[in-house]
Swiss-Prot record:
It comes from Clostridium botulinum (strain Hall / ATCC 3502 / NCTC 13319 / Type A). Gene3D superfamilies: 3.90.320.10, 6.10.140.1030, P-loop containing nucleotide triphosphate hydrolases. Its cofactor is Mg(2+); [4Fe-4S] cluster. The heterodimer acts as both an ATP-dependent DNA helicase and an ATP-dependent, dual-direction single-stranded exonuclease. Recognizes the chi site generating a DNA molecule suitable for the initiation of homologous recombination. The AddB subunit has 5' -> 3' nuclease activity but not helicase activity. This is ATP-dependent helicase/deoxyribonuclease subunit B. The keyword Nuclease applies. The gene is addB.
Amino acid sequence: MSLRFIYGRAGSGKSQYCLNSIKNRIEEDIDRPLILLVPEQFSFQAEKNLIEVLDEKTGFKTQVLSFKRMAYRVFNEVGGITAKHMNESGKSMLLYNIIEDNKNNLKVFKKAAKRQGFITTISDIITEFKRYNITPEIILNNLENIEGDNLKYKMEDLALIFSQFETRLHKNYIDNEDDLTILAEKLNKSKQFDNAEIWIDEFSSFSPQEYSVLEKLLLKSYRINITLCTDYLNQGRFVDTTDVFSPIKNTENKLLQIIEDNNIKLDKPIALNCDPCARFKNSAELQHLEKNMFSFPYKEYKNETKDICMLKTLNQFTEIENTAKDIIKLCIDKGCRFKDIAVITGDLEGYENIISSVFLQYNIPFFIDKKREINNNPIIVLILSALEVLSKNWTYESVFRYLKTGLLDINNEEMDILENYVLANGIKGYQWTNDKPWEHKFFSNYELEDQVEKELLAKINDIRYKAMEPIVTLNKNFKSIDKAKEFCEVLYEFLCNINLPDKIQNMIEDFKVEGEIEKASEYNQIWNIVMEVLDQIVEVIGEEKISLKEFFKILQTGLSEYEIGLIPPTLDQVMVGSITRLRSHNINTLYIVGVNDGIFPSPLKEEGILSDDDRKFLGDKGLEIAKDTKSIAFEEQFLVYSTLTTPSKYLRLSYPIADGEGKTLRPSIIISRIKKIFTNICEENDIVKLNGEEEELKNISSAKPTFNYLISNLRKDVEGAKIDNIWGDTYKWYLENEFWIEKLNRLIKGFDYTNQSKYIETKKIRNLYGKPLKISVSRVEKFSQCPFAYFVQYGLKAKDRKIFNLSYPDLGIFMHSILEKFSHELEKQGLEWDTMDLNWAEEEIDKLINEELDNKSLDILNSSKRYEYVTKSVKKILKRSIWLIGEHIKRGNFKPSYYELSFDIDGDYPPIAMELHSGEVVNLIGRVDRVDLLQKDGATYLKIIDYKSGAKEFKLSDVYYGLQLQLLIYLDAILTELAERSGINGEPGALLYLKLDDPIVKNTVDMSDEEIEKSIIKNLKMKGLILNDPNVIRDMDNIISGISDIIPVMVKKDGGVSEGRSSVATKEEFETLRKYVRYTIIEICEEMLEGNIEIKPYKKKDGSSCDYCIYSSVCKFDTNIRGNKYNILIDKKDEEVWDAIKKKLEYKNI
C-alpha cells in the first residue's frame, strides 16, 4: 500500500511516463493487475495512446477505466445494483411531481418552483449533495446550527424535496450519482484491485465520493501513482489561492491527509523537470509561454514569433473565415493533418453555426464535440405540440407547430391553404373541434364567384378534417383517463396511429442516402428516448392521478433533459469544442477563437440556490459542498493555463471587436498579458485592408470561397475599379475547370442583370387592367408613387396575407361607414348638425356601432378584450367627431348637402370621363365623404371634406407630382356636373381634410369646460386649400379673428387674408389647378396603358414610397443594381409650384 506522485508542469510528459511505466511492468512480467484510471471523457483517447505504446499482444494486460467503468466492473463482480438506473430525464420528471405535490409546504421555493429551469437547478443541487456525501438526514441534523431564517428555510425545503426524491426513487430505480457511494462500500468485497498498480492521470481534483473510492483503493492496491500538473509539491502546506496550480496543490493536500489517516506509505515522488519539456521540444515560443504566462515576474521574449500568433477581426464571421483560411494554408504548406487541429471557444453556442457554415464552404472536415439537445427535433416538437394544442385550447401557434413538423399526412400546399384561412378568420379553440364545417368567407364577393368560394371552402374543410382527425381522436381518448400510466398508453397509441415509427425509419434511410450521417444517428436515437421517457413516467408515477396539463409539463420536463451524443464520422477532421473538453484530444495546433472579455476566461457563474455566503457558512459548520463562485474563478486560471499549453506546434488566439449585432467586444486580459510577454508577437488584423498581391493571396484557398472572392473582384473590374493581376490567373483556372466553368459564365452574365422591365406589351396590359379602363383616383395616385407597385397590386392582383386583425385602413373604413349612416339618420330625422341634441347623437353612435358588431364580418371586434377597448375608443372618437362637425357647422353658413357622394355607373354622378390623346375614354370612379354648399351672390360654393383617421396635410407640391389629386378632381367633376346638368354656377370654396380623433388635452386641472373644448377644436383644425375670398372665408368661420382655429387661414386686422400664413388660392388659381389635374391624370393613364411598369419609387426628404410598401420583396429595388434609381421629388415652395404648373400648361397649350 503506497501512494506516489508524478508531477511536472504542462508538457513535461506525465501521461507518457505513465504509459511507459505500464509498458515496463508488462515487460517485467510482474503478476499484478495494471490499471490506468482517467476521467470519463479521456477514456477513448487514453486507450488509443496505450495501444500506440503497447503492442496488440500485451495491450490486453492493462485496463483503462474511469470511475463509472470501475463501478460497473465491481458491481458485475460482487453485485450491488438490483434496480435500473434513472437518468437525468427521469430525475427531472420525478422532481417535478414531488415539487407539485409539496408546493404548499415549501417555505422559500413556492414561487420559484413555477420558473423555467427551476427543476434543473434542484436536480443539480441534489447531485452536488450526493457527490459530497450529504444525505437528507445530515441536512436535517444540522438545521439547528444554521443561523438566519432564509438559509434555514432553504435547507428545510431542500431536505424535504431530497428526502422524498430518495424514497420514491429507490422503489424502482437507483440514481447514477449513487454509483460511486455504492462502489466505495463494495470495494472491500472485490478482488479485482488486490495488489494492483494503478496510474491515475488527467485529474486536477476529485469529489468527496471519488476520494472515498481512492481511499479504499489505496488500502487494497500495491501502489497508486497519481499525476499532478504542478511546478512543485506542496507537502501539506497552506495553499495560496492566487497560485495557478492551487487546485492541484489542494488535491495533493487532501490525498496526503487520506494516507496519513490510514497510515499508508508515501513513495518518493517522480519529478519531471524539463527544459525544454517533451511537448515543446520543437517550439521555444510555446515553452516560453508555458513558463511565463502565470509567472511573476515574467521574462520577456523579444524575438519575432511564428508559433504563437494573434488575430484581431471585425466580427465573429470574419474571425472564423480567417481561421478557415489559416487551417487550409497549414495543411497545404506544412502538411498538417485535420485531426491534429482543434478550434475551441468559451462560447461554443455563439460560434457553432458560424463555424459550421464557414468550414463547410471551405471544405474543412470538422466535428463539433458537444451533445445535441433534442427539443428542436421534429419528432419531439410533434409530440409536445400535440399535447400543447390540447392543454392550451387549440391556439394558432400550437396547432401549426404541430402541423408543420412534416410528420403528418398533409402537404405544403394544403398547409398553406389551411393556414391562410385560419389566420384570416382567427380560428381557435372550439372552432377546431366543432363538427360543423367552417363557413367564413375567404374572399370578398367581387374577388371570386360564389361557386368558386364554395369549392374552396369545401377543400379547406377537407384539409382541416384530414389534418385534425388524429389529434381530435387523441383529445377524446384523453378525456376518459386520469392516471399517468394511461396518458402514456394513449399517447403511444396516437404515435403509432400516425405511423411515426415507420416514418422515422424512412427518414433515417433518406439521411443515409444523402450522406447526412449525423442526422441519421440523431433520428435513430429519438424514438428510443421517447419510449424510455414514457417507461420512466409509468414506473415512477404511473398510478398517480394527474391532469393533461400536468402530463404535458412532466413529459416536457423529461424530454428537455435529454442530449444526444454523436460519434465522429471520420478520424481526420478538425475538432471543434469548448475549452473544458479540449484535453480529451491529442492536438498539436490550436485555434482559440473569441478571446474576449467575458468569454475566455469564462465569466463568474451565477450563485444559484445557495449563495456564496450560504456555502461559506455551511462549510464552516462542517457541511462541505461545492466551491463558491470566487473559488471557481481562481481555479479558472488553471484551465486557461492548461488550454494555452495544450498545443505542441502552433497556437493562434483571435478576438473580434464586435459581435453579430454590432455591439462592441473587448479583448480578454489574456491578450494583453501575452503581448507583454511576447513584445514582438505575430499579430494580424482584417480591419484595415491592405493592397498588394500578398494580401490578395490570403483570399485564395478552397475552390468555393475563392470563387466568391473572384466574382467580387470581377464585379469591381466591370465597374472600373483596379484589381490585382492574380485574379486574372484565378479566372483562367476556373475557366479550365469543367465543374466551375458553367457557374462562372452564369454569374458573369449576372453582372448585366437588372430587375427592371420598363414596359410590357399593350395587349397584355389591357388584359390585366381591363378595357375600357375604369379606375379610382387613388389608383392614379398609386401609379405616381411607383409604376411597378401599381402593376403588382392592380395588374397581378398580389395581396398581402390576410390576418385576423383590424388594421388602420380597416378602422378608417369602419368609422367612415358609421359617419355615413349617422349623417343619413340625421337627415331622416329632419335634424340639423348645428341644432341636434348631443345626447341623442351619442346614443345613435352607440346604436349604429352595436348593430355593426352583430355583423359576422366584424366578429373581430368581439374577439378579445383588446378589441373591446378598440371599440370603446372608436365610439369616443366618433362622438367627438360629430360634436366637432356640429361646431364647424355652427361657425359658418355652409350646409352639408351630400354624404358619400359617389362617381360610378350606379352612383350619384356618373364616372369622371377623361379623354386620352388617342380618343379613348378612361372612367374614374370614387367617393366624396361630404360636400357642403353655400348659396351666395348667385353662385353655389362647394366645400369638399375628406374624413381622415390619421394626419393628412395638403401640399401643392404633391399635387404637382401627381401624389394628391383626389379632392381636386372631385371638385372639378362636381363643378362640371352642376354646370352641365343643372346650369348652376358652381364655385370652389374649400378642399379640406378633417381628422377623426379624440385628442388628449394636457394640464386640464385649471381649465374650464369651454377652454378644453377650444383646445380640442384647435387640435383638430382642418388642413387643405381655401378660396382666397374674405367673405367666403367668414361663411366658413364667422368668428375668425387672426388665426382661425378650424380652417388653415389667418385674417389681418383690415379683414384681408394673410396669404403667407394661409393655405389659399384665388378663383383663377383653382381653375388652373383643375386644368392641371385633368392634364396630369390623362398623362398618368396614358403611361399606364402604354405598359409602363418601371421600378421607380419616389423619394422625398421625409421618406419614399418604399417605406411602407409590401411589395419590396417582389421588386428587389436596390440602388446598387443597374437601372435602379429613385424618382427624386424636391419639395417646392407654393410660389414655385404655381410657376411650374403655369409653365407646363402653357407648354402644352392647355
